[in-house]
């Protein structure tokens, strides 16, 4: 009697498990597709909206130990004109990968558009200077390309809530953007001061900056 019942129970359990397994697979695939939709396909960093959502969440939870960095590729048009668009894409992918590496698993990196990126990293205040210096070195390393390498130059601006007396993300981005512009083409990370946060802005960006006037007005 027992011998005949066990196979039937096993079959019944298997039959019940099949729809569950199918639903789990469907959910996993759906999650991957949704995640991919929020990622920039070239650099695999987060798109602007997804980056903003995650950065705001980090700021709400860890405002005492975060650093926001804005990065802008220098001489990018010249690189494209000289080496071709494939080389430009390779350089952008390298910037995204290096920012993601620098931000680490507890941080977030995103592509804001074109050759502009942002990263928010959790770093204890006593380690922030060293980590920013490391980022500057990281961004000057040549990018392997075909049988050689591409030169890479990136302008960097950094802002912390303590430095600008605000944990508001648009304020931090405005300050980091103004600091980055101040140190354009130097290869250094310029750290934002309180006055950088008061620079007139459009959509949280320094007024007059490329792309700042889209769907916004000066603040």
What are these regions (language model features)?
Residues 35-53, 71-84, 93:
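Conserved nucleotide-binding and Mg2+-coordinating catalytic segments in signaling enzymes
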Residues 171-217:
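Catalytic/regulatory signature loops of cyclic-dinucleotide turnover enzymes
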Residues 51, 55, 91-92, 96-99, ...:
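Heptad-repeat coiled-coil signal-transmission/dimerization helices
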Residues 148-179, 195:
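A short glycine-enriched loop-to-beta-strand structural element that forms part of the catalytic core
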Residues 1, 217-219:
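Non-catalytic regulatory/interaction regions at protein termini and inter-domain linkers
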Residues 96-162:
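GGDEF/GGEEF active-site signature
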Residues 2-41, 49-59, 65:
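Signal-transducing coiled-coil linker helices
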Residues 54-83, 110, 150, 216:
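Active-site-proximal structural segments of metal-dependent nucleotidyl cyclase/transferase enzymes
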């Amino acid at each position: 009697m027992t011998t005949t019942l066990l196979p039937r129970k096993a079959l019944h359990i298997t039959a019940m498990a099949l729809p569950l397994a199918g639903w789990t697979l469907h959910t996993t695939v759906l999650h991957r597709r949704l995640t991919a939709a929020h990622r920039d396909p070239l650099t695999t960093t987060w798109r602007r909206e997804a980056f903003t959502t995650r950065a705001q969440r980090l700021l709400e939870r860890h405002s005492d130990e975060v650093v926001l960095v804005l990065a802008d590729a220098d001489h990018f048009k010249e690189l494209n004109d000289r080496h071709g668009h494939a080389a430009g894409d390779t350089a952008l992918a390298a910037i995204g990968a290096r920012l993601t590496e620098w931000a680490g698993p507890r941080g977030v990196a995103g592509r804001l558009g074109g050759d502009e990126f942002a990263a928010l990293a959790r770093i204890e205040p006593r380690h922030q200077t060293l980590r920013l210096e490391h980022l500057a070195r990281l961004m000057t390393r040549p990018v392997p390309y075909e049988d050689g390498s591409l030169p890479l130059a990136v302008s960097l601006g950094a802002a912390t809530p303590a430095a600008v007396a605000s944990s508001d993300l648009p304020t931090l981005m405005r300050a980091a953007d103004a600091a980055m512009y101040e140190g354009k083409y130097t290869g250094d990370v310029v750290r934002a001061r309180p006055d950088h946060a008061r620079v007139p802005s459009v959509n949280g960006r320094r007024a007059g900056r490329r792309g700042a006037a889209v769907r916004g007005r000066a603040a």
